[in-house]
Each structure stands twice: as structure tokens, then as C-alpha cells.
Amino acid sequence: MWFKNLQLHHLPAPWAVTPDQMEKWLAPHAFQPGSSVEMQRVGWASPRDDGALVYSINRQMLLLFRAEKKLLPASVVNQVTKARALEVEEQQGFKVGRKQLRELKEQVTDELLPRAFSIRRDTRVWIDTANGWLVIDAAAQALADDVRSLLVKSIDPLPLAGVHVARSPVAAMTDWLLSGEAPGGFTVDQDAELRSSDQGGATVRYVGHALEANDMRRHIETGKQCTRLAMTWNDRISFVLTPSLTIKRVTPLDVIKEAADPTAQNDDERFDSDFTLMTGELGRMLTDLVDILGGDRHDSIHQAAA
């Protein structure tokens, strides 16, 4: 249930969108299996396998982005194309040109696609309409871009904005690493990455290792800055913070696992309980994280204008 990665975006808070309205927006872009000659197909699928494209409880929505892609290695295409080009050269008596080779490659791709295996990847999207968060559970930026692209295509207009904090995450992480502590109920854990801003980009990584203050100071004095830092929020959730404010390796700790509703009678009730618990905890953590990074600049601009 728990998201492993958090790609953060802002929506208006509150965002007056109902589950029914969201369902209508997504329906024209529902996932359909690709044809035998399509390399990739994307669309919205049911998060609960019940036909509904939107799962919603307590103003929290869950969407599911599905991508189907054919597995056709470039090495296979190139190998078959090369063999086909040799045959053509023997027939026509001269070397295949660039344009002809490109056409052969396209022909080979079309022939091999129907026999290629397909893989599906599902990516979850959490929308907090009460507090104005849209969060994509994706580690890779390219995947998050694909999800955002379909969101924009499905919801017009989509009032989506990035999260721009007042303080640079790199500067903040470097200071926390140097002092060995972070503010606001956050603690520094034992994983960190320090990278030099020089052209060479020398990098030092610590994994499961005590982050000694003297070692950190020595690296920072030579021009390195912290670009990844493992942290824990209120002894409840551990995660890794990155320069882009993407949050990775999100893990609920024992105190949250023990808070799961023991009275849930079936899978639906357990899902409701788990999703409510996850969104509540992550929502509070995100608010605290933005606060210790100086607040959201977008909110500050609006307050100043008012």
C-alpha cells in the first residue's frame, strides 16, 4: 500500500473536484491493451480492480497509471537488419545506403513487434484535494513525466504546480549533516551522499555508516555538498531526501505498522484503513518538511500579494 517514492506537486488547497468529476475526466483515457504493432500504450486503470478509475475516501483520491511496453531489444533489431541488408546488397549489387538501411530497420521492427513480449507497469497517483497535494509514486523522472503528461491530457485545465521551498534542499541537508541534527521532529540517519560542485564531481557515499561530524566537516570544507540524506520523521517514517525535493525509499516504521486498524473485517476495509493511515501520516510529514525548508515560496507570494 505505502508509496515508496514521492514526486511532489501542488494543487489549489482545497481543490473542489469530486470523485465523479475525476472519473469523467479519466474515462476517455482509460487503458486499453495495445495492438500487436504498437510499441507502447498508456492509460488509466482501476486502482482496486473494480472497474472504477478513481478510489476516494476522506477527500483523498488514488489513481493508477498503466503503461504497456513491448520488449524488443535494439540489439535484436540491429542484428536482423544487418542480415537483411547483406541480402539486399547481394540482390542489387551495391551497398545499402543510409535511407534504405533506415527503411529496412523500420520494416524489421514492424515484423518483430507482433512476436515481442509485453510488460505492464503500474504507477500510483495520490491526490489530496483537501490540502492541495498531488504525489506520484515514481523513482525515475522520466516515468513521472509520462504520468504528468497523461494527467494534463486528461484534466483540462489542470492547476498543477511544482513545490518551490524557500531554502535549497542541498544547502539545508549540508547544514544538517554538519550539525548532525535536523529541526522539526526530523532526525539524520546513516545514509548520505556528498558531491563536489567542481567539474570532476567527486562523490562520497555513506551507507549504513555513522556520519561522524569531523568527517562531514572535512568533506564540506573541501567544497562538497550533501545531495542525498536519509532521515526519519517523528520516529514514524524514514526516507531519503534529494536536491529536487523528490523523496525516495519511504518506509513506515513499527509505530505506524502497529497503528493499523485491527477491526478491519475484509480486504476493502483494510484498504480503506491503510490508505487513510498512509495519506494522513504522509500529509503531516510533507507539511513539516516544507516548513523546515522555509515554507513554500508560492504560498509566500500569494500572502504578500494579499
Curated annotation (Swiss-Prot):
GO terms for biological process: DNA recombination; regulation of DNA recombination. Transmembrane segments: none annotated. One of its GO terms (cellular component) is cytoplasm. Coiled coil: none annotated. The keyword Cytoplasm applies. It is found in: Cytoplasm, Nucleoid. One of its GO terms (molecular function) is double-stranded DNA binding. Its main location: cytoplasm. Keywords: Cytoplasm, DNA recombination. HAMAP family: RdgC. Belongs to the RdgC family. May be involved in recombination. This is Recombination-associated protein RdgC. It comes from Burkholderia ambifaria (strain MC40-6). The gene is rdgC.
